[in-house]
Amino acid sequence: MFMMNTDSHLFLDEPLADALPLYEAKMIHHFDHRWAEYDLEGSVNGLSDATKCDFSYEPRPRYWVERAEVDRRLAAQNWKHKWLIGWRDICRKTDYRTLIAGVIPISAVGDKFQLLLIGLKPSLAAALLGCIS
């Protein structure tokens, strides 16, 4: 959705009232949209199990994007759901998998998390996610 280099002028360092987090691929893992977060120094850290038990906890991204810009880009794709399915863009010899898929809430998304914006019913989209994971 957002190229991390050419769209960087849209990124906010602090959240505004109507801004959405910018999820990066490194923050997501299998069936876990709260795999990691940025600390205040800009380092990525995994979330503890205790933190993940707090269902209201939202991982801190490095950047935020105004909701209107995210809505505009999703509307251009005719996307009406409150969630996104995608996969991490990975290709390292240390990875056991060539695809790590996940579901995230509506948010801004960096270019290393490839989105799958298809017109399936949510139940079929969930089945597809299970198959590709």
Write out the residue ranges for each language-model feature:
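Polybasic, glycine- and aromatic-enriched phosphate-binding surface used to engage nucleic acids
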Residues: 1-133
